[in-house]
């Protein structure tokens, strides 16, 4: 059977499933109940459910049943300098499902000056034929013009896209000026879309890269040395400032440093509508590996912004994720082979950027945050699924276990322990940046669209069964505050009369001359004129010799607060 009229794309056959004896964990509550699913939807939740015959029953045995994970940042089948990442939409979504993720949001990256709409359709074609789980798409704005503006509007209103990423780095390629950021944020806010930013100071990075190469530093360590965390933090602050001025919600992707986390946290405490997205790599490892003697290993960690060389950073980011200062997690999964990375063996600026993390994301967060007592199981659901669904207007279809929601579920075993290895992971990448790491917490059963996709470590997937999920504009979770602030922030001029006093004539001022009464040296304080009280014209009676008229000693001026409308006259 075809899917939505598309040829050669199979439609998934949903099973009638009953999960018994599980502990349902949503972002706001946990409780024991059974779940019945049919036609890809959750039909019943409760005890002693009455279900039709022929139902497949899964015994959860008291294990947690959580909403399927949503990975909000992936780069599958991404073109790069004539190459493509080794994980396409088939291999990448297989790895996602193996880790407990049932939906991804991938990034469309148009070439500079290329059509955003055409790039979007190209990504749709690639994904529709290969994905094994549901997906949506962000679209990156790689240049800005009136025609791009029209395309953005079309994508929002007709194509199901509600988020767009702009770059503050990659000078002379994707980097936007402050003026362009202001215009883009203003326009996205009017459409009800979400502005995402890759936050780094591209101008300074370009200078620092040249400096490193001049110093003879050509290896992967040059990548992090040319991109200190201050350059990420500066761009984060600038993006927050511009977004605030335009009253546009801001989503900071790939939060990698303590400084950036702190800025996002402070902005949220001040009431700014800003969201921060740490990724699997920044939550699970650090940038000390850039100095590895093994070039291939060091290159595997190259991504931008870079991982912090401060080894205490992952724990710090996990703490702020647990406290709510950061809200959502992605993987930024973009995998290249060692041979592909090696095109930059003599110049670190040419190393393709990207790390793995789509399969490890949920286990890394459980191990680093839940198993350590930083967050509870409900917060875990929030940062791996629910908050993402709310931000991108997918909730409660996604991100919640409730009647009517999609039957994307995971039976999660908090006691499972696995050792990460490139030999056993489902990615096509030959190196795993979490190699040898022992992680607590793993999925036992993964259900997507009401079908068992993974059970007992074995995948049961069908290529091309993933659906494109439309993301509507103006998500309440994001825009309720924006709308209220728009009403409160209406600006009005001060009502006043026309100024009818003298106006200085600039045309009469010599162009190259020095203004009268001043010198070309340092400015000096002018001494104000002082009336000589011994001058013969001075009188205590109130009538002065240098005044043309007689004034009353106690005349009172009556005027409304702020003065009369004619500001050149007091009478």
Swiss-Prot record:
InterPro entries according to UniProt: Amidohydro-rel, Hydantoinase/dihydroPyrase, Metal-dep_hydrolase_composite, Metal_Hydrolase, Metallo-dep_Hydrolases_sf
Subcellular compartments: Cytoplasm; Cell projection, Growth cone
A molecular function (GO) term: hydrolase activity, acting on carbon-nitrogen (but not peptide) bonds, in cyclic amides
Keyword Cytoplasm: yes
Annotated Polar residues bias: 516-529
Region (Disordered): 509-571
Single Gene Ontology BP annotation: actin crosslink formation
Subunit structure: Homotetramer and heterotetramer.
Its biological purpose: Necessary for signaling by class 3 semaphorins and subsequent remodeling of the cytoskeleton. Plays a role in axon guidance, neuronal growth cone collapse and cell migration.
Full protein name: Dihydropyrimidinase-related protein 3-A
Gene designation per UniProt: dpysl3-a
């Amino acid at each position: 059977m075809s899917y939505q009229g598309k040829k050669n794309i199979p439609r998934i056959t949903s099973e009638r499933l009953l999960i018994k004896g599980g502990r349902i964990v949503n972002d706001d509550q946990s409780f024991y109940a059974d779940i019945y699913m049919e036609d890809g939807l959750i039909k019943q939740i409760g005890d002693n459910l009455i279900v039709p015959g022929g139902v497949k029953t899964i015994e959860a045995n008291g294990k947690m049943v959580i909403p399927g994970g949503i990975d909000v940042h992936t780069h599958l089948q991404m073109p790069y300098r004539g190459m493509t990442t080794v994980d396409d939409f088939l291999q990448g979504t297989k790895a996602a499902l193996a880790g407990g993720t049932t939906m991804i949001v991938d990034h469309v990256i148009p070439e500079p000056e290329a059509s955003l709409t055409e790039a979007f359709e190209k990504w749709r074609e690639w994904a529709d034929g290969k994905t094994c789980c549901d997906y949506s798409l962000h679209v990156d704005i790689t240049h800005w013009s009136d025609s791009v503006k029209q395309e953005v509007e079309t994508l929002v209103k007709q194509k199901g896209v509600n988020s767009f990423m702009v770059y503050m780095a990659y000078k002379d390629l994707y980097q936007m000026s402050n003026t362009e950021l202001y215009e883009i944020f203003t326009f996205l806010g009017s459409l009800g879309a979400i502005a995402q930013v890759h936050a780094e100071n591209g101008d300074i990075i370009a200078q620092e890269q040249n400096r490193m190469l001049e110093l003879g530093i050509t290896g992967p360590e040059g990548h992090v040395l040319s991109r200190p965390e201050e350059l990420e933090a500066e761009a984060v602050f600038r993006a927050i400032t511009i977004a605030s001025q335009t009253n546009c919600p801001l989503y900071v992707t790939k939060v990698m440093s303590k400084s950036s986390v702190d800025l996002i946290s402070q902005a949220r405490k001040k009431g700014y509508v800003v969201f921060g997205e740490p990724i699997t790599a920044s939550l699970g490892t650090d940038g000390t590996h850039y100095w590895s003697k093994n070039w291939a290993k060091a290159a595997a960690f190259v991504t931008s912004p870079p991982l912090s060389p401060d080894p205490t950073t992952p724990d710090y980011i996990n703490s702020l994720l647990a406290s709510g200062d950061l809200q959502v997690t992605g993987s930024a999964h973009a995998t290249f082979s060692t041979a592909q990375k090696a095109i930059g063996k003599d110049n670190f600026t040419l190393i393709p950027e990207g790390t793995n993390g789509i399969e490890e994301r949920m286990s890394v967060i459980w191990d680093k945050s839940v198993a350590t007592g930083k967050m509870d199981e409900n917060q875990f659901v929030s940062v791996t699924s629910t908050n993402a669904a709310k931000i991108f207007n997918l909730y409660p279809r996604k991100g919640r276990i409730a009647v009517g929601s999609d039957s994307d579920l995971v039976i999660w075993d908090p006691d499972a322990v696995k050792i990460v290895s490139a030999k056993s992971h489902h990615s096509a990448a030959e190196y795993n940046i979490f190699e040898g790491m022992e992680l607590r917490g793993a999925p036992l059963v993964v259900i997507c669209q009401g079908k068992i996709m993974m059970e007992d470590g074995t995948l049961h997937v069908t290529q091309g069964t993933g659906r494109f999920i439309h993301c509507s504009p103006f998500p309440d979770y994001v825009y309720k505050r924006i709308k209220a602030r728009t009403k409160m922030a209406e600006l009005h001029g001060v009502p006043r009369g026309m100024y009818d006093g003298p106006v200085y004539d600039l045309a009469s001022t010599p162009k190259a001359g020095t203004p009268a009464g001043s010198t070309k040296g340092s400015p000096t304080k002018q001494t104000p004129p002082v009336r000589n009280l011994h001058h013969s014209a001075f009188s205590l009676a109130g009538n002065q010799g240098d005044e043309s008229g007689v004034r009353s000693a106690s005349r009172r001026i009556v005027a409304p607060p702020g003065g009369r409308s004619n500001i050149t006259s007091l009478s």
